[in-house]
Amino acid sequence: KASRQTKLALARKKLKKTQQDLAYESGVSLRSIQMYEQRQRNINEASVTSVRAIAKALHCNIEDLLEPVFEYKETSAA
């Protein structure tokens, strides 16, 4: 099953930027961008400075890059 693309990858591709373009424009390392896009590193746990720089380079809001967090509610045993 192919995993869906990260919001970061979708935003970057929408602007037809390469990962290298984004690294250069944001000042965030190419390796970090690759890891966020491949979900080897969680962008939600990245520094605000990094996410803000990436968002600025992609002309979007920080919230547009964060991945949804699934909340699991505890069910009480009946």
Mark where each language-model region is:
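Conserved hydrophobic/aromatic packing and binding residues within compact polymer-binding modules
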Residues: 8, 22-23, 33-36, 65
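Short, basic-rich loop-to-helix N-cap that marks the start of a DNA-contacting helix
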Residues: 40-56
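Alpha-helical residues within the helix-turn-helix
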Residues: 13, 24, 56
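A short, Lys/Arg-rich alpha-helix, primarily the initiator
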Residues: 1-16
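Short coil turns linking two alpha-helices in DNA-binding domains
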Residues: 18, 29-32, 47, 61
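Short, charged recognition helix plus adjacent turn
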Residues: 56, 63-78
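Recognition helix of helix-turn-helix/homeodomain-like DNA-binding domains
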Residues: 28-44
